[in-house]
Amino acid sequence: MKDSLRERLDQMVDRFEEVTALLSDPDTISDNNKFRELSMEHSELSEITALWQRYRQAEIDKKDAQEMINDASDPDMKEMMQEEIDSASRDIEAMEEELNVMMLPKDPNDKVPAFLEIRAGTGGDEAAIFSGDLFRMYERYASSQGWTIEVLSANEGEHGGYKEIISRVSGNDVYGRLKFESGAHRVQRVPETESQGRVHTSACTVAVMPEVEIDDTVELNPADIRMDTFRSSGAGGQHVNTTDSAVRLTHIPTGVVAECQQERSQHKNRAKAMQMLIARIQQAKVQEQVDTADALRRNLVGSGDRSERIRTYNFPQGRMTDHRINLTLYKLDAIMEGDLTELLDALNREHQADLMASIGGGDD
């Protein structure tokens, strides 16, 4: 292990002890925000420091076994000590790899809720139907994770599915799990309306954006935001409102638009549309930085650009292929039912490998 990493881990142990003491301080306990922030930091540090302590103990065990094997004359004793050395070496290697991953830079947005947008692209009715299939897939996955999905806006297709559906997903680590879903999703299958049995290709675009706290963003000039109201039909065309409760917000300098029509209250719709507008403006800024400076995300996991084709769902072959990491899974039925864990884990591992490669090299 690099000396620089050992030094950082020792510093984290010191910080863990400091945070532990602070959590018992009456001033901290009386400050809810400070107590919550320190509790989160304590939780993250406890996992790393515990693993670091096990790593150091394994090093001690290996060293002790090596000294015993050097002094031993009995062949059976030497064999037993060698087995301990081999076991400790395997443990050390595995723990070092885990520590390297845990020490990678964290995306501060990983734990926040996210806005999930799905839009039908090329393919007409079939694209809209597939948008509905994708939304159902994410709904099933969200349910398996204990998350909540709230539909903010929906424009249904004429033959099912959605021309566009926008939702808010809340729960633990939502953005961190879904952030690599942004891009173009292509489907190859025989539409129900196809009498000749020919396979058609259509596509949908997915965008995943972190929900940004309004207090954490640059202030928007109210004069730069235009609000339009209109009557909402709600999801599925039901509960038609007789008042203009739906809200569309436009940020004039950037042209970014957000709308919400699911609440009966115009005030609630405006608040949710404002959250979405801020998230979109923030995402546009991030994308601009990616386009100009950050080559890392564009390597394997991708830029998150909606126009970038990231995945193909081939129904005749029962396969899903993610083109960014050359991963093909022959379990399409399960995937469409929300079984995304294997896929999302693979994307995160690839991203971690990218990060490790980008910061590798340094001192030994």
From Swiss-Prot:
Which NCBIfam families does the entry link to?
A: prfA, PRK00591.1
Q: One MF term in GO for this entry?
A: translation release factor activity, codon specific
Stored InterPro entries: PCRF, Pep_chain_release_fac_I, Pep_chain_release_fac_I_sf, Prokaryotic/Mito_RF, RF-1
Q: Where in the cell is it found?
A: Cytoplasm
Short name of one Pfam family for this protein? PCRF
* Keywords recorded for this protein, A-Z: Cytoplasm, Methylation, Protein biosynthesis
Which protein are we looking at? Answer: Peptide chain release factor 1
Gene Ontology, cellular component aspect: cytoplasm
Q: Where are the transmembrane segments?
A: none
Q: How is it modified after translation?
A: Methylated by PrmC. Methylation increases the termination efficiency of RF1.
- Family from the record: Belongs to the prokaryotic/mitochondrial release factor family.
Organism phylogeny? Bacteria, Pseudomonadati, Pseudomonadota, Gammaproteobacteria, Moraxellales
- Function field: Peptide chain release factor 1 directs the termination of translation in response to the peptide chain termination codons UAG and UAA.
Annotated positions of the N5-methylglutamine modification = Q238
Q: Which domain of life is it from?
A: Bacteria
